[in-house]
Amino acid sequence: MAVESAAVGVFDSGVGGLSVLREIRARLPSESLLYVADNAHVPYGEKSAEYIRERCERIGDFLLEQGAKALVLACNTATAAAAAELRERYPQVQLVAMEPAVKPAAAATRNGRVGVLATTGTLKSARFAALLDRFASDVQVFTQPCPGLVERIEAGDLYGPQTRALLERLLAPILEQGCDTLILGCTHYPFVKPLLAELIPAEMAVIDTGAAVARQLERVLSARALLASGQAATPRFWTSALPEEMERILPILWGSPESVGKLVV
């Protein structure tokens, strides 16, 4: 039986999910947090659905062994590939997943033209196709796969010339189509929002789902009387790659230095 003081487990293919973790910390400061970055297998966007599901199951099992009361799948690609299977695997655990913000973007656009930056895996998924069918039938959606962008962010290169050149190339087709709304369909991408702001029109709306995931987690925990109160424990971090590499990047993306454990699953 889960208890209020138990931690929330959050995981992603890499450090992108830290953008979601920041939103959770801001909205639910009493919640203790566990975070797993599967950096040894990043990016998920170019992997098969079967491969991603296996990784998600191993990481989910690990986080539950650490006592997590809820799981947050802070990865759009993993949600598309594995969310349904994880809900079947862990029926007793609250699972909050994420998906590209098609619904709010369709509501926000003024000219009916929406651009999407996402991984190849997300854009090819049946889940994304279903989102378009359900919420975007009245708007034009222009998708742009972004190979290489996750890797730049994983390296901590949020403002450098290579990242700028890559973003300029990725944005060009969307800007040529006159889109007035841009969906960030990967949890890594909010980390380059400041650079994006220099490359897109000031009036273009940029939408991601980190804050919405934090709100959904709050609703799920509250409905089951699992919201924590009081002082949260120090966040705990693990990576499947080199801990020292993640320790180097955490001050940049998380805002403070942290100790990182080695995940072997």
Curated annotation (Swiss-Prot):
Positions with a binding annotation for substrate: D12, S13, Y44, G45, N76, T77, T187, H188
Signal peptide (from-to): none
Keyword Isomerase: yes
Superkingdom of the source species: Bacteria
Catalytic activity: L-glutamate = D-glutamate
Molecular function terms from GO: glutamate racemase activity
A Gene Ontology BP annotation from the UniProt entry: peptidoglycan biosynthetic process
Active site: C75, C186
Keywords per UniProt: Cell shape, Cell wall biogenesis/degradation, Isomerase, Peptidoglycan synthesis
InterPro entries recorded: Asp/Glu/hydantoin_racemase (IPR015942), Asp/Glu_race (IPR001920), Asp/Glu_racemase_AS_1 (IPR018187), Asp/Glu_racemase_AS_2 (IPR033134), Glu_race (IPR004391)
Annotated pathway: Cell wall biogenesis; peptidoglycan biosynthesis
Pfam families referenced in this protein's UniProt entry, alphabetically: Asp_Glu_race (PF01177)
Enzyme Commission identifier(s): 5.1.1.3
NCBIfam families xref list: glut_race
Function comment: Provides the (R)-glutamate required for cell wall biosynthesis.
Alphabetized PANTHER family for the sequence: GLUTAMATE RACEMASE (PTHR21198:SF2)
UniProt record similarity statement: Belongs to the aspartate/glutamate racemases family.
Descriptive protein name: Glutamate racemase
Originating organism: Pseudomonas aeruginosa (strain UCBPP-PA14)
